[in-house]
Amino acid sequence: MNAHHSVSRRAVLTGGLATGFLLAFHLPLRAAVNEPVQPRDTTEGKFAPNAFIRIDKTGRTVLMMPQVEMGQGTYTSISAVLAEELDADWSKVEVQHAPPNDKLYGNPTFGLQVTGNSNSIRAWWLPLRQAGATARAMLVQAAAIQWGVEPASCTASKGEVAHAASGRKLGYGELALAAQGQTPPKDVAIKDPRDFVLIGQPLKRLDTPDKVNGKAIYGIDAILPGMKFATVAACPVFGGKVGKVDDSAAVKLPGVRKVVVLDDMVAVIGDHMWAAKKGLEALKIEWNEGPNAEITTKDIWEDLRKASQKDGAVAKSDGDIAKALASGDRFEAAYELPFLAHASMEPINATVHVRPDACEIWTGTQIMTRVQSEAAKAAGLPVDKVIVNNHLLGGGFGRKLEPDMVIAAVKIARQVDYPVKVVWTREEDIQHDVYRPVYRDQITASLVDGKVSGWKYKVAGSAVLARWLPPAFQKGIDIDAIDAAVDAPYDFANFHVEYVRAEPLSVPTGFWRGVGPNNNVFAVECAMDELARKAGKDPIEFRKSMLTKNPRMLAVLGQVAERSGWGQKLPPRVGRGVCVQPSFASFIATVVEAEIDDIGEITLRRITSVVDTGIAVNPDTVKAQIEGGLIFGLTAALYGEITIDKGRVQQSNFHDYRMMRINETPKVEVIVVKSGEAPGGIGEAGVNAGPPALRNAIYAATGVALRRLPIDRKLLAAGKKA
């Protein structure tokens, strides 16, 4: 029999989940955490011991996914965790989106059915293993009773229970009805990691075949009988409202069904998308632009810089920072990051059918239950009368943590008696986003004997959590905005972090892939390179001297130095830059090699990343997420910026909010460290590693210490600091 160790449900809930909780947002633990072995589904003809597993009498194994799939590989990894402990036949595993239900499928960290913060595997690692092990134990018990033997004499493997002494076997499908009658055990045995069969193997993704053959259904793919199409124009100025609408020309166009006017937007419903689009273009709209019509990016930065001079709320303070900064070689710098849009390949959309007594929604969202509750308010219905059908997301990146597109679609659909698919154009999507905030991170440090003796860090910027999850905003501190500032990996004896809340004039802000560490990691790692130069030390050796209490971080840094060829001679104007970071309970070190020509153009030559993510459930997914995250972050560093003029976003599509292209992408090598530690998060780690590593490569190649993104090529050509 496989070796196992016993873990009680109480230990999982009070120990495992609480630990995962602290690794995320450090939020107060909710009163009623998820108990994954309940409830059972008593539908005849299948074995459904808990909310996650369904096995019918043919052996078909359906796993219910509490997290959403938006390209990050979660469906495959979560399925592997369940199937590992269930000892399922991987070839028979299918996945389904779980319906909205916080009690059954609420993320154990947040208490909400939400996907984000590189949290899926971390949050569900123990609960889903327990759910799978519980189901396996019930199947084994059913077989043992049928054979008249002890359960301990039976083994489970690949969807079968076997009794070696007699040579008998029964498939899970054959045992489904009998197992359904078993009482779920209170304590279950989960596998010793040494006995893993699926976890740790490079598994092919379960969603790939349907994405290749076109069967995969995204939110935008929903098609219903009698459905019409709509598109919208929102007030171009944030906070503005609809004034007058002349729809006389629009309603005469073939296929145009209705013009719907809301407070801040106008929609045209048509028989098809083209009719809706042409109808919208034919409208004459006068906007009441409101008080924000003259706001510019310059105004926003002036406000932020002024706010950053205030004393902030103290998030962490160790040692005597004033004394430390009064001695040694002093260093001061401020690092600034711009607004960024999400620009998912699938623009925001929702299909809605509102009836007098019910509302049904088809979309792709990262937060199903919030969508359900907000849609209920918009429809004027009880929550239990709202059905949310969630589909694959064509990119989320935090944008689909917001319910605004569904709220608008419900309000539009209330005006008619048929289902309506509402699709925002790329232009409307980019110009009416909830943007990654502008941030200003100030660092004051002192050097004594070649090491940092004092480190004072002040973050100024938007408090996204104050809006999105108010209980997390306490004592004037947004714990997301200072996440990697308080969790810097280095041994700083005198360490002080402050936060100043500064909301940008009129511009809505939200989470963006990488969340709080976006700004923190960039500032910390850029400052460390500048301090290394000030101390006359190699950047990697400088970091190593202050990582002695962080062995996992030290190990990946050593490996990346070796694998990247750190220290080997480079041609003129070619540099290597490094970034190290603890990231969502993972540890990643990255080296970017880049060439900068005489006019400031940048060529990425090579990227090397070493990541210790604990037990890598699917190493292929880890590599893919680091590769994709690096390109996502480097795109922002090279090109990403949303600017405001006269209260309007100036960018509109990929021609002026551009993405990195294939010919610009260098060779990327990702090394996944084998580890027995609990899994860390991986979906966002690469995003935050790329920008500072590139900036430090530029610094090494040119001596130009850039302190603002996106990278200004003119400054590189001129050889100036910015």
Model features per residue range: what roles?
Residues N2-F25, A32-A722:
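Cofactor-binding beta-sheet edge motifs in enzyme active sites
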